[in-house]
């Protein structure tokens, strides 16, 4: 625990093409081994595919996808009297965004239907914007867990 007050959050710079911080976070999440230029090619290529297939602005489609993927509730384990309960808690806005981006990229990587990562990412973004796909299913599962454990909500800290 730091003694000099709360830890400062690092400010992320917006990406060069769309000048958007969410896109910059998406690029950082796609990046492997510090290879940012490759991650940028993947994300911008996926955005080109989204623009081509939907005819809409890819930022709007990404925003719609993230709104359908970001969880409102999640469960956290808490020990109470020798038993561990799964306690539903609200998710902070920063964590909602990072979970949404993480799940989009994770389920895009797992897809078997496309060949390249940019095709997979574009397909996952479009599916999430249409309320389908693996990332949306993950959010629904998370909400279902929170709803099932609603009886333990009074143990919140």
UniProtKB/Swiss-Prot annotation:
Transmembrane segments: none
PROSITE patterns according to UniProt: RIBOSOMAL_S7 (PS00052)
Keyword RNA-binding among UniProt keywords: yes
Example of a GO biological process term: translation
One MF annotation (Gene Ontology) recorded for this entry: rRNA binding
GO cellular component: small ribosomal subunit
Record-linked InterPro entries: Ribosomal_uS7, Ribosomal_uS7_bac/org-type, Ribosomal_uS7_CS, Ribosomal_uS7_dom, Ribosomal_uS7_dom_sf
Keyword tRNA processing set for record: no
Gene3D superfamilies referenced in this protein's UniProt entry, alphabetically: Ribosomal protein S7 domain
Keywords of the record: Ribonucleoprotein, Ribosomal protein, RNA-binding, rRNA-binding, tRNA-binding
NCBIfam families: rpsG_bact
Family: Belongs to the universal ribosomal protein uS7 family.
Assembly description: Part of the 30S ribosomal subunit. Contacts proteins S9 and S11.
UniProt cross-references to PANTHER family, sorted A to Z: RIBOSOMAL PROTEIN S7 (PTHR11205)
Function: One of the primary rRNA binding proteins, it binds directly to 16S rRNA where it nucleates assembly of the head domain of the 30S subunit. Is located at the subunit interface close to the decoding center, probably blocks exit of the E-site tRNA.
Protein name stated in the entry: Small ribosomal subunit protein uS7
Lineage, broadest ranks: Bacteria, Bacillati, Bacillota, Bacillota incertae sedis, Caldicellulosiruptorales
Gene: rpsG
């Amino acid at each position: 625990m730091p003694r000099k007050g709360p830890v400062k959050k690092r400010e992320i710079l917006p990406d060069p093409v769309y000048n958007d911080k969410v896109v910059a976070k998406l690029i950082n999440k796609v990046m492997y081994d510090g290879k940012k230029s490759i991650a940028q090619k993947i994300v911008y290529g996926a955005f080109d595919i989204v623009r081509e297939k939907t005819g809409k602005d890819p930022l709007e489609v990404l925003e719609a996808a993230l709104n359908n993927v970001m969880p409102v509730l999640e469960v956290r384990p808490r020990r109470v009297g020798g038993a561990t309960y799964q306690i539903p808690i609200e998710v902070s806005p920063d964590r909602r965004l990072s979970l949404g981006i993480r799940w989009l990229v994770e389920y895009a990587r797992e897809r078997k239907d496309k060949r390249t990562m940019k095709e997979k990412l574009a397909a996952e973004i479009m599916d999430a914007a249409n309320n389908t796909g693996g990332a949306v299913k993950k959010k629904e599962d998370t909400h279902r867990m929170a709803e099932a454990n609603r009886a333990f909500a009074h143990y919140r800290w």
